[in-house]
Regions:
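N-terminal secretory signal peptides that target proteins for export/translocation
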Residues: 1-11
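Propeptide-to-catalytic entry region of secreted or membrane-anchored zinc metalloproteases
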Residues: 32-175, 183-190
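Walker B catalytic acidic pair
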Residues: 178
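Sec-dependent N-terminal signal peptides
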Residues: 13-21
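N-terminal secretory signal sequences
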Residues: 2-4, 17, 30-34, 39
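C-terminal segment of classical bacterial N-terminal signal peptides
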Residues: 22-31
């Protein structure tokens, strides 16, 4: 008889647990998964005699929040996965006035790399952010005669920051592509 009472007690506990679990799930109270959310700040640059930029930093911020974020979630979430490895991007700060350069932005070689290295601290100084080690920066540039639409320095899979230069483009595809380089992804032969 005691054995039967224990079995009934255990069945009641299991039924109660299942009922609570179903209640949580049906009300949308499922456990949250870890999302690797990264911040992208946006600035514009210009120089004397530069043409007008096709878009602006606010448009690029919208593109990041809507299209780039959705693309990266798609790229990094595996079917059946709990989402713990999903990478998400959101816009942080947007500089309201372009940074005026003393000369036209360089497109290739050492001067182009030097520009990428020097614009980052200046942009963050103007944005009022002193620790930008875990932030990405998108720099929107007017047409400078470059053959590329976007450029980024190669990072590593553990990188949590990087700089992307957009050459008169606000393309979500180009931004998402360049962010891939900041993760250490190169080009493939496919």
């Amino acid at each position: 008889m005691a054995h039967v009472k224990n079995a009934i007690g255990i069945k009641k506990k299991i039924a109660g647990f299942v009922a609570i679990l179903i209640g949580f799930v049906s009300y949308g109270l499922t456990p949250a998964f870890a999302l690797d959310e990264r911040v992208i700040d946006v600035v514009e640059v210009t120089w004397g005699g530069a043409p007008a930029i096709r878009g602006d930093a606010k448009v690029v911020a919208e593109v990041i929040d809507k299209e780039v974020n959705a693309d990266w979630k798609k790229y990094t979430t595996m079917v059946g996965d709990d989402g713990a490895r999903t990478v998400s991007f959101k816009t942080g700060k947007v500089l309201d006035k372009p940074i005026t350069l003393v000369s036209k932005m360089a497109c290739t070689g050492f001067p182009a790399s030097e520009f990428m290295n020097s614009i980052r601290p200046e942009a963050y100084r103007r944005l009022g952010i002193s620790d930008y080690s875990n932030r990405y920066l998108v720099v929107l540039s007017p047409r400078a005669g470059c053959i590329w639409s976007g450029r980024a320095q190669l990072g590593s899979p553990k990188s949590k920051s990087g700089t992307v230069i957009m050459h008169d483009s606000e393309s979500s595809f180009v931004i998402a592509h360049e962010l891939g380089h900041t993760f250490g992804l190169g080009h493939s032969n496919f």
